[in-house]
Amino acid sequence: MFTPRGFKFAGVHCKIKRKRKDLGIIFSEVPCVAAGVFTTNVVKAAPVIYDMEILKKNPNGIKAVVVNSGVANACTGEQGMINARRMAEKTAEELGVPVESVLVSSTGVIGVQLPMDKVENGIEEAARVLSNDPLPFAEAIMTTDTKVKMHSTKVMIDGKEITVLGIAKGSGMIHPNMATMLSFITTDAKISEEALKKLLKLSVDDSYNMIDVDGDTSTNDMVIVLANGLAGNTTIQPETDGFWKLYEAVHEVNQVLAEKIVEDGEGATKVMEVHVINAPDIKSARLIARSIVSSNLVKTAIYGEDANWGRVIAAAGYSGATFDPEKLDLFFESEAGRIKVAENGQGVSFDEEEAKKILSEKKIRIILDMKQGKETAKAWGCDLTEKYVEINGRYRT
Amino acid sequence: MFTPRGFKFAGVHCKIKRKRKDLGIIFSEVPCVAAGVFTTNVVKAAPVIYDMEILKKNPNGIKAVVVNSGVANACTGEQGMINARRMAEKTAEELGVPVESVLVSSTGVIGVQLPMDKVENGIEEAARVLSNDPLPFAEAIMTTDTKVKMHSTKVMIDGKEITVLGIAKGSGMIHPNMATMLSFITTDAKISEEALKKLLKLSVDDSYNMIDVDGDTSTNDMVIVLANGLAGNTTIQPETDGFWKLYEAVHEVNQVLAEKIVEDGEGATKVMEVHVINAPDIKSARLIARSIVSSNLVKTAIYGEDANWGRVIAAAGYSGATFDPEKLDLFFESEAGRIKVAENGQGVSFDEEEAKKILSEKKIRIILDMKQGKETAKAWGCDLTEKYVEINGRYRT
């Protein structure tokens, strides 16, 4: 894992959870330009409301993010807001930075107040053990995740080597009260506030916003990007060459993390990747890709290894996009091969044995060629299994 | 079951399906004013496209509906349109009525052409056995439904006794390629075309449009109302006294049928009824009720008899409606009692034993009091079970 210059990480166990690490800090030696994308849920957790305010006031002066897992600090009213602010204050005290330079994040059960004594002890300890190793932080933000989710890459811009490192969590298949998706991207690129905002929005629309585990949007979802400028490149402005180079790097990180989130669910046995190609416009392409990947009927068909093309076409049809259904070609693809199952909106005869072989793989691509434009979109999801129902039916608040 | 004056029904087995009845006709002795609401899916089955055209051209002259089950005639291209039209022609020939007075409907597997020889034999036979008994028709439109779905009521308008009879099918839990929702309402009321259209739209918005079985919208869904005027009342005009009286009767029929559709699914063990009350506006009330009833996490919680209020609040939050989450009160209710689980958007302590007892019933009401307006909406759905996944994962195209 590459670590961008000037960032330090920590993850500790402060006993919000019984055994595993539950509190983490990211710290930058110098102030960062920061941008965030937050849950669209009307019911927003206290840290989400807190961070939106901080990023409005101080987008060029962020020095730290403090995150706890185990308790979401959502549906917690006024006391929740006081606790979110206290997390920032305590972190600022321990790190010797201004309060308004600290962002806060939580993930875990809804409707429970944070145990602030434990949280404050955790912050003290984490501030003492900051290091170049991002792994303890990645572990500390996990809830029901079974795997750590990190990805990094490097890119040359303006003769300078720039590093991008992303750390995420999210696992909707298991205890979905804890299904929050969190992602923290750090980079040593130098970039303007406007450019960073634009870049993050563009990338999120084609990564985290295109994954579906169970269709339910958490109260705590957030993606934060911190750029501390230590690579020493000329400040990147919107839609310049440097902008697109950094975009590619950040987007690689976000797409890899989004796929890792989809892959990681005990209930899931398969990953679906839906490609919508030759769509009339980008909005329709995205609507259709998301609709297919979110359909319970498509999810169960993939689980059952059934080349049920009618369900895919129907899901495209109710996506909300307007299009000519009589132009659609549909393919299923995997390591084992590729098969055409529909042409011009109608089924074609295909070898059931071959289809079965293709669908028996772990990663299935569903390719919908709309033949009515040039836009494309990709979405990722997983299958729907008895295990999902079992786990979510049994889970107790 | 009350039957409106002048309507006759038939249902026969013409071997599209192996054993059960698969072709039905509704016939009115005199021309009907007719209105229809059709699937919003962009991918529309041939009979849907055909009927939309007929109702545009001839809304005051409908005399019959012919319906087959077993094959949906969806994703069947030009041949599908030819076959839909041929069903109407054959029915018109056998009944001695104009072709443009016949509506067509299909439900069953997608992507397969109708076996027209069997269908035509079925139409011949059905036309011969028309009677006052609606039961054979109700049986003939079933696919994976385990129960016949009919409801009738009477209302006095203008000194005349008016009868409304509805016959429906729909069962998304089992073989969802056949999950089409069909509903045919017959009445002997005399009503203007404009009034009938308005009345149907109003009622559908608060009945069929508020049920969720698996979130997937069929290519074949349709609701048709036929009014033949034989009750002899003065023609009902929009928003008169008579209009609202007939609305109440039709709406009773539609709500009962909608609930029967939700109840009938082998995979389902419980029915949920979501009441959103004191909402800021009707659109928000409906969005929120539908969002809750469609949430996989709420569905599995109900299945698991878990008073997981956080999932309900979160589903309200991502519904797309804008509201103040800090005003929400939430209750679970059933035959066994009623319990408050959240107040002003936050959890309240409640007796877990009592909650368990309430949620162990077959019919669960979730009541969300928004305390920010006067509008209400109801939605119906069922739980999500391992059985649903098992059935849909195994089902083969």
UniProtKB/Swiss-Prot annotation, chains A, B:
Q: Which reaction does it catalyse?
A: N(2)-acetyl-L-ornithine + L-glutamate = N-acetyl-L-glutamate + L-ornithine; L-glutamate + acetyl-CoA = N-acetyl-L-glutamate + CoA + H(+)
Which residues catalyse the reaction?
A: T180 (nucleophile)
Task: Point out the annotated site residues (description: Involved in the stabilization of negative charge on the oxyanion by the formation of the oxyanion hole).
Answer: T107, G108
GO MF annotation terms: glutamate N-acetyltransferase activity; L-glutamate N-acetyltransferase activity
Keyword annotations for this protein? Acyltransferase, Amino-acid biosynthesis, Arginine biosynthesis, Autocatalytic cleavage, Cytoplasm, Multifunctional enzyme, Transferase
Q: Does the keyword Transferase apply?
A: yes
Q: Which InterPro entries match?
A: Arg_biosynth_ArgJ (IPR002813), ArgJ-like_dom_sf (IPR016117), ArgJ_beta_C (IPR042195)
Protein name as annotated = Arginine biosynthesis bifunctional protein ArgJ
- Species this chain originates from: Thermotoga maritima (strain ATCC 43589 / DSM 3109 / JCM 10099 / NBRC 100826 / MSB8)
Q: What is the lineage of its organism?
A: Bacteria, Thermotogati, Thermotogota, Thermotogae, Thermotogales
